[in-house]
Amino acid sequence: MKTLGNIPVIKIESQIFEKLEKNINSKFKMEKLDNSSKRLLPILKELKAVTDSMVNYYGKKEHLADGFAKGQQLHTNFLKIYKRYKESSDAFKMEVANKSKERMQKILETYKNEGSLIKYNLTILINSCEDFVDKMDNQKLSMTTFIKGDLGKLKKAQQNILVASANFQKAIANEKQLKKENYTKERLEIFNKQLAEFEKSVTIFIKEIEKSKSMSKSEIEKKVYTEDMAGTPNDVIKKYNKLVNDYNNLMN
């Protein structure tokens, strides 16, 4: 999204077409994902043609001369194409997610078959943490709306983290397993410290939502959260990003 004057206009970069075409023409064929890409590509090109016209139209300030006459038609065309784009884009994202799940399942099976129980449980744990963050994102929870989050879904995701965390701690308590996978207690301690920070932030996050359920509308409106407060969406994501960094260090 770019702004021309005070008017926001979507700009689609050409590189996205190159990436889709490269994936479609790849020697590694994935039928469902390739088909989703093939459906998405022409619609995306249509959308780019309209958005490029909008950028040109507003960039040259033609809207000031014709009283937005052409602009109205461009916006009408954009909305028609965007509806088709949204449907194809959602299908494409679903296929990407499915492929990602398949790939992760193969990785987990490999770890399990080779007896790498620490890596196995660590991968499940980080996926559980990612799932919690995804549920926050799917509910579009922000600093001002997060206390309205779906408590049931979020608590279930939190419970998955706690179960995965407990299994991971059991795995790293085995001295023979540590030696087999070439891990030291010092390296794992760094990860565990950040894991505790993330779990604490998630716990506070959940408690804030629970408390809001018994608050009146006026009490909720008076409640003020700052970005650096523990348990806010920003804090959860900040702690999660640090955890992912420590996870990557462990896996390398």
Region roles according to the model:
Residues 153-252:
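A cross-kingdom marker for long, charged
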Residues 66-76:
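A short acidic/glycine-rich loop-to-helix N-cap element
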Residues 10-20, 54, 80-93, 163-171, ...:
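Amphipathic alpha-helical coiled-coil segments
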Residues 75-195:
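Extended amphipathic alpha-helical interaction segments
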Residues 1-66:
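Post-signal peptide N-terminal segment of secreted/secretory-pathway proteins
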Residues 35-38, 42-45, 49-52, 76-83, ...:
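Solvent-exposed, polar/charged alpha-helical surfaces in well-ordered, non-transmembrane soluble domains
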Residues 23-27, 51-65, 99, 103, ...:
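Secondary-structure edge/capping motif, primarily at the C-terminal ends of alpha-helices
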